[in-house]
Amino acid sequence: MIVFPEHALERMEERGASRQEVRRTVWEEESFPDRQDRMGFRFEFEFGAEWNGTYYEKKELTVYAAPGGEDGSDWIIVTVISRFY
């Protein structure tokens, strides 16, 4: 399960990332260790649309999450970084 705290949801909205995109990035894409037992996940999406008045071909999400749940199999989203290009 992926848990979206209010802070993460606010940052996602500000940065143009949907829950669906974050879920895909966490479950299906490249991961890398981060500090303090967190993990980072990264995925490049075909975008082909405007964001804040500028057209971009691609969008890259970097998701930082901490393990959660009783058995550590859940992910609690810490923050999401979006990069458009």
Enumerate the language-model features and the residues they cover.
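Ribonuclease/tRNase effector modules and their secretory precursors
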Residues: 1-85
